[in-house]
UniProtKB/Swiss-Prot annotation:
GO terms for biological process: photosynthesis. This is Cytochrome f. PANTHER family: CYTOCHROME F, PTHR33288. It comes from the Eukaryota.
Length: 320
């Protein structure tokens, strides 16, 4: 009886331990996968600096293209699409945090004019919902509804991201006006090279922090290298730690200069930013334009009819 109780107690302990480990894994996995936009959100009050540079470029060092497509003009209180395209070669593989190769993820930030915001789900058409898919958008700050971020998401599926945007109504929002507004966008593909604290990720190259001879190279069990550089003048040693991912370019006995690359650069992604323009159109102005065009068309019709009538009169007079 005592043996059965002992086994039961051990079984309970093992079950609890496994449950705790699974919970920790799920929490850490979720926080890592959703951390990339949060890096910028935690570090910067505004994602666009005074110089016009979007802060994502501080971590994603390679420059890559990005494109935005918006309507030329929209009416107040109207849902429209802002399409952000993040082009890249879908065959490329990036270095993951564990040093293995995997597909590229993408992310984007769109900075709208004040008053413009993410459209609520009940205002979306079925076609727009289909384009959006399973994307989850969030505001950069709770009080900054005009700045929207998304990602990281799989690049093969979402290299084109559709943002559903709701235009403001100046009749209900005093800060909104019928004007032409700029829209700014930033988009990245792949992991960054630098973390917000300034440390390097394993998705970049590493260089020597001292000149000297490579006296020892140790390949770590979990990947990566430990390189010992010995200064020939005073035998001072510097140990360089290389994480798993970048490929080693140096060998033992080789003399290195200061800042000489120790590894290749595995980065295949990059960040880009662009801009567009949109006009918040006054409906009365549109109605006035339509009325003017209708008046012009009617005037042209009357002129044609009058001309034909005049020609008939002339023809009748000539026959007399």
């Amino acid at each position: 009886m005592q043996t059965i109780n002992t086994f039961s107690w051990i079984n309970q302990r093992i079950t609890r331990s496994i449950s705790v480990l699974l919970l920790v894994y799920i929490i850490t996995r979720t926080s890592i996968s959703s951390a990339y936009p949060i890096f910028a959100q935690r570090g910067y009050e505004n994602p666009r600096e005074a110089t016009g540079r979007i802060v994502c470029a501080n971590c994603h060092l390679a420059n890559k293209p990005v494109d935005i497509e918006v309507p030329q003009a929209v009416l107040p209180d109207t849902v429209f699409e802002a399409v952000v395209r993040i082009p890249y070669d879908s065959q490329l593989k990036q270095v993951l945090s564990n040093g293995k190769k995997g597909g590229l993820n993408v992310g984007a930030v769109i900075i709208l004019p004040e008053g413009f915001e993410l459209a609520p789900p009940d205002r979306l058409s079925p076609q727009m919902k289909e384009k959006i898919g399973n994307l989850s958008f969030q505001n950069y700050r709770p009080n900054q509804k005009n700045i929207i971020v998304v990602g990281p998401v799989p690049g093969q599926k979402y290299s084109e991201i559709t943002f559903p945007i709701l235009s403001p109504d100046p009749a209900t929002k005093k800060d909104a006006h019928f004007l032409k507004y700029p829209i700014y966008v930033g988009g990245n593909r792949g992991r960054g090279q630098i973390y917000p604290d300034g440390s390097k990720s394993n998705n970049t190259f590493y260089s020597a922090t001292a000149a000297g001879i490579v006296s020892k190279i140790i390949r770590k069990e979990k990947g990566g290298y430990e390189i010992t550089i010995t200064d020939a003048s005073d035998s001072h040693q510097v140990v360089e730690i290389i994480p798993p991912g970048p490929e080693l370019l140096v060998s033992e006995g080789e003399y290195l200069k200061f800042d000489q690359p120790l590894t290749s650069n595995p980065n295949v992604g990059g960040f880009g930013q662009g801009d567009g323009e949109i006009v918040l159109q006054d409906p009365l102005r549109v109605q006035g334009l339509l009325f003017f065009l209708a008046s012009v068309i009617l005037a042209q019709i009357f002129l044609v009819l009058k001309k034909k009538q005049f020609e008939k009169v002339q023809l009748a007079e000539m026959n007399l």
